[in-house]
Curated annotation (Swiss-Prot):
Superkingdom of this protein's organism: Bacteria
The protein's annotated pathway: Amino-acid biosynthesis; L-arginine biosynthesis; N(2)-acetyl-L-ornithine from L-glutamate: step 2/4
The name this protein goes by in its record: Acetylglutamate kinase
Record's subcellular location: Cytoplasm
Any Pfam family matching the protein: AA_kinase
Record keywords, A-Z: Amino-acid biosynthesis, Arginine biosynthesis, ATP-binding, Cytoplasm, Kinase, Nucleotide-binding, Transferase
Catalytic activity: N-acetyl-L-glutamate + ATP = N-acetyl-L-glutamyl 5-phosphate + ADP
Record keyword Nucleus present: no
Top-tier EC class: transferase
Signal peptide: none
Chain positions recorded as substrate binding sites: G38, G39, R60, N147
Record site: Transition state stabilizer: K4, K209
Length: 249
């Protein structure tokens, strides 16, 4: 199974370690690959160096200077997560061309879209009982680093491996009328997801998550769930279909 982890769910050290413990427990039942972003950490490191953050359609505009900081921040976070999980191998997507990407839009700078996943490397690590922990820096056509969206990268990994994926975020799932708890959807077919985007009840940062989830399903992932990473015990429940919102083709 693929676990996409990032955002507010990793702001607290205590919460990060709790999620790491859940990942370690889940690993006893099935192989797990962790794909992570690092928005809050990247923001902090950029601000400390006086580099302004700029976004376009939810994607970070990434200059070569900012890319160096992004890669450094993700490498540090990757090491921390790997240590928290235990029996894990921390990798950035550039390592062994694990994630290969093309430039998404020259106007965004060093921002890419994953075009190939080194699934063989991941299967080799899983085969010897290790948990790959993947930070979202890909290798571009020129061999240099590209910043890739963690949601879409995780979806690409799920599709390449043909495994289910759980996106951990800071809400319990997808709401038809947020924050009404009664409107939390336990399951959404593609047609209703598209309607939700069109009608505005799926918006903002949730859009790339649902797009990535649908792309993962199209590529062969058997399931995709969006669930909260802010509460203990959710990960295993989401994997069983008992928490979050499960997207279906």
């Amino acid at each position: 199974m693929i676990v996409k982890y990032g955002g507010n769910a990793m702001k607290s050290v205590e919460l990060r370690r709790a999620v790491a413990g859940e990942i370690a427990a889940l690993r006893a039942e099935q192989p797990v690959v962790v794909v992570h972003g690092g928005g809050p950490v990247i923001e902090r490191e950029l601000a400390a160096r006086g580099i302004a953050s700029e976004f376009s359609n939810g994607l970070r505009v990434t200059s070569p200077q900012a890319m160096a900081v992004v890669e450094m921040a993700l490498a540090q976070l990757n090491k921390q997560l790997s240590q928290d999980i235990g029996a894990a191998v921390g990798l950035l997507g550039r390592d062994s061309e694990l994630l290969v990407a093309e430039v998404l839009d020259p106007a965004l700078g060093r921002v890419g879209r994953v075009t190939r996943v080194n699934a063989g490397l991941l299967r080799t690590l899983l085969g010897v009982g290790l948990t790959p922990v993947v930070g979202c820096v890909a290798v571009g056509p020129d061999g240099d680093a590209l910043n890739v969206n963690a949601d879409t990268a995780a979806g690409a990994v799920a599709g390449a491996l043909g495994e289910g994926i759980v996106f951990l975020t800071d809400v319990d799932g997808i709401y038809r009328a947020y924050p009404d708890p009664e409107s939390l959807a336990s399951q959404l077919p593609r047609a209703e997801v598209e309607a939700g985007i069109r009608d505005g009840w799926i918006a903002g940062g949730m859009i790339p998550k649902v797009r990535a989830a649908l792309e993962a399903l199209d590529a062969g992932a058997p399931f995709a769930v969006i669930a909260s990473g802010m509460q203990p015990g959710v990960l295993a429940a989401a994997a069983r279909g008992e928490a979050g919102t499960r997207l279906t083709p």
